[in-house]
Design a protein with these regions (language model features):
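Conserved active-site/ligand-binding neighborhood in enzyme cores
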Residues: 4-151
Length: 151
């Protein structure tokens, strides 16, 4: 059995739901979070030169997946601590999405230049759009890190 906590900007009634590409049945227990809660404050902090993924990340186009956004406004990666890519699929409107590979949660990115944006401010163009932007379903949700000795 796997227990997973998730954040959602869309309110769900507590109960049992089918999720995932293979229709896994999960129990959802919704808890309202206020703007003053610690998790919201952490998620709203701008990312400087390092961050860690708390959900798997899929960046790139509808055809290709990458470890980072492939745009000129995303800083170059100086260092990256990660594991091998993981399979990633989602289901919307009764249809199973294209199989992709995602950067696993827990991966740490160190950037050459500060990003100065929280995850909420990241452009949707950084994520694939398959009828719905993968950002809207939480792809690449991350928290800033403060790594000592990192200039």
């Amino acid at each position: 059995m796997c227990i997973r906590d998730s954040l959602s900007t869309y309110s769900l009634e507590s109960g049992w739901y089918k999720f995932g590409g293979e229709n896994h049945v999960v129990e959802i227990n919704s808890i309202k979070i206020s703007k003053d809660d610690l998790i919201i404050k952490l998620l709203n902090q701008p990312i400087k030169k390092s961050f860690a993924l708390i959900t798997p990340a899929v960046f790139g186009s509808n055809r290709l997946s990458f470890r980072t956004p492939q745009t000129s406004d995303f800083p170059k990666i100086k260092l990256m601590l990660t594991d091998k890519a993981i399979p990633y699929r989602h289901r919307t409107q009764g249809r199973l999405s294209r199989g992709r590979y995602a950067v696993p949660a827990g991966s740490v990115y160190v950037l050459e230049e500060p990003l100065d944006k929280s995850w909420w401010e990241w452009p949707e163009e950084w994520f694939p759009n398959e009828g719905i932007s993968l950002k809207k379903i939480g792809s690449g949700l991350c928290l800033p890190l403060d790594i000592k000795g990192l200039a």
